[in-house]
UniProtKB/Swiss-Prot annotation:
Organism expressing this protein natively: Rattus norvegicus (Rat)
Lineage of source species: Eukaryota, Metazoa, Chordata, Craniata, Vertebrata
GO molecular function: ATP binding; lipid binding; non-membrane spanning protein tyrosine kinase activity; phosphotyrosine residue binding; protein tyrosine kinase activity; signaling receptor binding
Positions where Phosphotyrosine occurs in the chain: 50, 207, 409, 520
Protein name stated in the entry: Tyrosine-protein kinase HCK
Tissue: Expressed strongly in spleen and at very low levels in thymus.
Record gene name: Hck
Compartments in which it is found: Cytoplasmic vesicle, Secretory vesicle; Cytoplasm, Cytosol
Amino acid sequence: MGGRSSCEDPGCPRGEGRVPRMGCVKSRFLREGSKASKIEPNANQKGPVYVPDPTSPKKLGPNSINSLPPGVVEGSEDTIVVALYDYEAIHREDLSFQKGDQMVVLEESGEWWKARSLATKKEGYIPSNYVARVNSLETEEWFFKGISRKDAERHLLAPGNMLGSFMIRDSETTKGSYSLSVRDFDPQHGDTVKHYKIRTLDSGGFYISPRSTFSSLQELVVHYKKGKDGLCQKLSVPCVSPKPQKPWEKDAWEIPRESLQMEKKLGAGQFGEVWMATYNKHTKVAVKTMKPGSMSVEAFLAEANLMKTLQHDKLVKLHAVVSQEPIFIVTEFMAKGSLLDFLKSEEGSKQPLPKLIDFSAQISEGMAFIEQRNYIHRDLRAANILVSASLVCKIADFGLARIIEDNEYTAREGAKFPIKWTAPEAINFGSFTIKSDVWSFGILLMEIVTYGRIPYPGMSNPEVIRALEHGYRMPRPDNCPEELYSIMIRCWKNRPEERPTFEYIQSVLDDFYTATESQYQQQP
């Protein structure tokens, strides 16, 4: 819960996501039971018929004994939450609230919880990521739950923060412990972030340095706001935390076409178009329209149910589908479009190398998640990465590559087959695995470091295939560090099993500039 770090854009009404072509596949997925079943419409109810979201837990009735966790009594401190942000109701059953309002949780299920306002006694659904339990750390502006060290750095270095901006977060390595992250400046590296382990006393207190101990984290913050006492900076203000994206509407999975108002065509791909649209007059989304006949509706629905379960900060969120032809795929809206277009734009072409490495690290984090879940992307390239207004990169188009029914795309001779991104064993034998994704990631790194240049410039597809068979690999561009190029070369090993894992690639890219020094400051 809490987790105020999930959205990256202050101006984003409900997420951002512009989708090109899709592509993540569970290697061995048993399709039984994967089709959503339609719900009988209520005869008196005006409005769309919704099909349950395949990822949401079974609904509990408002009076269900299991609505709350075991041992939790309604109205006890455990069930009272406080609003971290204002929320204006947009669905019929929602409850509006102001930052600071307190509510009793009646039912916890999925991303929308049923609650009653203590002030107005009104009941309705609330977005669970907008509230925190009273007296919990999450009510503190400076506490960021479940955020990684790398994302803490991204947040603190973002515009709107200053010297001494800080956050306390859960430790990634030690369960139940915390870390303090502080924005600093040093002449050699410029703006930077320093991390301090917060250690725990046997008596339950906290300290960074044994000479200054505190009974609570709140006390620790007050102390280091007065003076730096050995830290790199005196703590100034909590890290800026924009409102998170509101969760997608409850149970709106297969939606009626009429609920989408198409507004602006963002692009056209091989299999359809991408539009900016508004869902039910209140939520900005991206809609990918698929040309009729490009895939079977049954195969698509089975794959979409699967893609919906892949939820990660660095993957574009799949919100809903229109399941009759022409198929519509509804995702979060991403303000800056594809990474390929962004890198070629005026803003993108000015991004310094450390930012390019950060883009690469974000993509490898998303791919490490896909790897961990035993999925495959099959079409990893800069055109299928989307960029948010605050330059967060998210992977799109996972899942669709496998179900496209177009020989131009599926056969290696086809005009649409992405030869230059595809591993030799996938070209020659149709063998797509996470290791062929690793090969594609090496090509994607080259796209990033050359600001969107087409791989193997000047070479035709047949020439590329022949060159690869003779051991040719793209040379290192002048602006590309040796360490980055060596990752590419490892991604392009002939034998798939010799290519690194995405988990390993992420660990190298996350610490690309700091691998030689300790991530955490020594005790002050």
